[in-house]
């Protein structure tokens, strides 16, 4: 009985992983009990332990989806009294826009995948230089993220990459492009040539996706709509779209230029896992797919593309003008696309929600860990230290502190805590309005730029790590950290220098 229960626990995860999670769950309450009995603040120490344990589950996302082990740790935190359901609900309410975005916008993008795949296939076949293609992915992702939203753009990138992978898999399994039932996660049907090319193709897709997702961070920091915390900071500071962009520009423009130079350099010199080219044999598959699409094109399929294009234009305008919360716009996209494309059966709609809902559940679990950080004031000593510094040094220190904390927790949460702290300091006349503006800029850039160091720093990175694409292209937590490392180093240094010079 116990053996069967152990086998079922966390499914087919390795035994050492299961044992580690069990050890966490046993050690946490014992540690809390012992430290409290010594008259020390056990909740603070165990709170940090739970944060690090949750990061561990994210780091090993390919061994076991983090929802289950991370969820068990979060449930234990509730039972140990490190937080409570009301604090968790408060965090969920605070981040409801992000949750709506994941539920509806990602599903909306699913119904636009034909248009996305057509556009990106043309780009893949038109741009012959891998370096130019990488720069294009990075630039377009940055541009779109500045006016749309980093998570939305990441959803597009994932949809496109999965589409590319499916085309490759169909061709190398000897199947027609029209086959809809093929399981592209099963490599047993691949030809010998396909197996040889598979790793090269995975590496090529990893390159493009990582350039693209870093691009979302480069663009996302620039405007109010780019990242959820930007809107929060702008609301507290009372900045409109243009004012926000102008205030951030002295930091964000040099960082963006440095990002594009970094993209060029790592592709040119084939470092940090980049510089993987698309073999000619694989490129020919996409030429064949393009020819197939043209040959199969009918008035109805062309009309579908036009509908997707018009709804895409509506999406861009609605997001750029912030006509509603991103998730509500996403729901509008679903309704428009499914209505005019005639997708009215429930099971056809259900497929669109499969990608995002597991991650949405994981994000809610993450908010449980965030509520532990808030209730146990895990970051308070750092905040107190920063606010105690000389005014001229506060902005650079805020930039660094925000970056470090965002990388290990979540940039939305860190930005929320810091912006509220400096708003309280402004209201109490501890700092001037000019100093408040400088610190708000440092908080925004600090939470957005260095947080690319780890996947848990940015929601877009975490979404990519836990998506169905990550295991397909062997994109693990540590591989993401290593591939993001040149960007992390260069952008953090350039951002820090820009903060020191301009603030």
Which positions does each model-derived feature cover?
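Hydrophobic transmembrane alpha-helices of multi-pass small-molecule transporters
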Residues: 1-107, 114, 242, 247-381, ...
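Transmembrane-helix boundary/entry motifs in multi-pass membrane transporters
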Residues: 93, 125-133, 202, 295-299
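Transmembrane alpha-helical segments of multi-pass membrane transport proteins and ion-pumping complexes
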Residues: 102, 106-114, 118, 130-133, ...
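Membrane interface segments of multi-pass transport proteins and intramembrane proteases
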Residues: 119-130, 346-351, 386-389
């Amino acid at each position: 009985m116990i053996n069967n229960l152990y086998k079922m626990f966390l499914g087919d995860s390795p035994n050492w992983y299961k044992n580690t999670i069990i050890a966490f769950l046993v050690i946490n309450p014992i540690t809390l009990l012992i430290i409290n009995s010594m008259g020390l603040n056990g909740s603070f120490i165990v709170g940090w332990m739970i944060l690090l344990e949750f990061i561990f589950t994210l780091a090993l996302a390919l061994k076991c989806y983090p929802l289950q082990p991370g969820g068990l740790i979060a449930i234990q935190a509730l039972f140990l009294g490190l937080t409570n359901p009301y604090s968790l609900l408060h965090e969920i309410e605070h981040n409801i826009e992000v949750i709506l975005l994941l539920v509806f916008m990602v599903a909306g993008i699913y119904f636009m995948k034909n248009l996305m795949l057509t556009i990106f296939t043309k780009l893949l076949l038109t741009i012959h230089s891998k370096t130019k293609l990488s720069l294009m992915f990075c630039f377009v992702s940055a541009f779109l993220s500045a006016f749309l939203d980093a998570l939305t753009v990441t959803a597009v990138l994932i949809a496109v990459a999965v589409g590319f992978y499916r085309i490759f898999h169909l061709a190398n399994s000897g199947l027609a492009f029209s086959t809809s039932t093929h399981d592209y996660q099963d490599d047993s049907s691949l030809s010998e040539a396909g197996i040889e090319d598979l790793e090269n193709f995975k590496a090529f897709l990893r390159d493009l996706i990582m350039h693209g997702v870093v691009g979302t961070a480069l663009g996302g920091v620039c405007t109010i709509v780019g990242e959820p915390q930007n809107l929060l900071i702008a609301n507290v500071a009372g900045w409109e779209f243009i004012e926000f962009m102008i205030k951030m520009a002295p930091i964000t423009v040099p960082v963006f230029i440095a990002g594009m130079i970094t993209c060029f350099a790592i592709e040119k010199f084939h470092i940090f896992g980049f510089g993987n080219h698309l073999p000619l044999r694989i490129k020919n598959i996409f030429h064949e797919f393009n020819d197939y699409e043209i040959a199969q094109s009918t008035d109805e399929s062309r009309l579908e593309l036009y509908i997707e294009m018009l709804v895409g234009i509506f999406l861009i305008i609605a997001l750029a003008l912030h006509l509603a919360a991103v998730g509500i716009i996403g729901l509008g996209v679903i309704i428009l696309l499914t209505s005019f494309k005639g997708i009215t059966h429930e099971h056809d709609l259900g497929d669109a929600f499969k990608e995002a809902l597991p991650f949405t559940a994981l994000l809610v679990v993450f908010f449980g860990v965030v509520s532990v950080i808030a209730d146990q004031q895990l970051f308070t000593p750092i905040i107190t230290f920063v606010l105690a510094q000389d005014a001229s040094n506060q902005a650079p220190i805020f930039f660094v502190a925000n970056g470090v904390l965002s990388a290990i927790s979540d940039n939305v949460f860190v930005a929320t805590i810091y912006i509220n702290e400096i708003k309280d300091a402004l209201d109490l006349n501890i700092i001037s309005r000019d100093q408040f503006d400088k610190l708000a800029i440092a908080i925004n850039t600090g939470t957005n730029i260095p947080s690319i160091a780890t996947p848990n720093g940015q929601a877009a990175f975490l979404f990519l790590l836990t998506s169905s694409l990550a295991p397909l292209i062997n994109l693990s937590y540590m591989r993401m950290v290593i591939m993001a490392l040149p960007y992390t180093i260069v952008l953090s240094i350039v951002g820090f220098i820009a903060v020191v010079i301009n603030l």
